[in-house]
Amino acid sequence: GFAACLGALLLWAALSFILSPYGVSLMGPRYDGLLPMALYILTALGCAAYGSWHDRYAVLLGISVSICCAVAVLQLLGFNPLRLYPEGYDYYGAGIWYNGSFLGTLGNTNLLGAFLCLACPALAFTAALRRGRCLWLLLPAALGAAVTALSRSEAGLVGLAAALLAGTPYYVNLRGRMRAALIVLAGEAALVIAALLAVYAAAPASGTLYELSEILHGRIDGSFGSHRVAIWGEALRLFAERPLLGGGPGTFALRSTLQFSRFVPESGLTFTTVADNAHCEALACLADLGLPGALLYLAAWAVVLRCWLRGRAPAAGIALLSYFVQSLFGIGTCFV
């Protein structure tokens, strides 16, 4: 199952690396080469074989999230405790006076959102299942969700929304109330459909909901999703160049020719960004490892989510589901 998928994925990545014509290093230009991938896979196999979820891990995670989010709150209030921003600027200068957006102890807001997509559902589910002395874990979970929203991490918000929508009926079913779980699921489906219809009929003039409305109307622009649509198109173009073996682990940044320029009237600066990441882990595998590599990656996820649906490790499972949904829009760089 899981071990077979990851073992085959590692072997395929090694073959792709050996036969790559791009001469990429073992580390990769963004620490996304074969060596980091091997470390991630071996870590996952070790955890799957010998690890298990314990309440004490949740407590340590809750403390870690609290510290990270406390720093983020200070930064959102205008302070610069970790010197993440240029001298004289704060978090709100992102995209105006300097390029990039940084928050918390992790820095990059996309990585922060990915971390909180893992942490918040795991903490909330542990609190709900254990109750008693674990109820306090709801506080760092709520704080993490608030920081995700305030940091405008769209991928993180999508991941947390998925955890809420999937986790609520799942939890009700775990408590032995399948009929109630089906009612909750039907109610959620009705709310989602109603929300989509509302966005379709009356969307705002700009922003994420405007872009969603345009997509629902069949009008798709490459600039949507902070240019993610264009980047995904670039990933598919790179896949078409080498559909079997891909370019090799960590070669997306070397092969991509996509660039964006943006003039900022408030500062008079022009920022140029190179698309050096697929902003979707599945598409990154497709471009770097070819179709077999992407299928093995998705097969490993399918095994994990199937185990969760069968009731194994519910707290860890909902966290992984949240991360997986986030990874469809995230940058996929390890934050450990």
Segments predicted by a language model, with ranges:
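Alpha-helical transmembrane segments of multi-pass inner-membrane proteins
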Residues: L10-F17, L34-G46, D55-L174, M178-A201, ...
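Interfacial juxtamembrane loops and adjacent helix segments
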Residues: P81-L103, Y210-S226, L238, P249-A287
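Acidic/polar, glycine-anchored loop/turn motif associated with catalytic or activation segments
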Residues: A235
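Cytosolic linker/terminal segments flanking nucleotidyl-cyclase catalytic modules
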Residues: A319, F329-V336
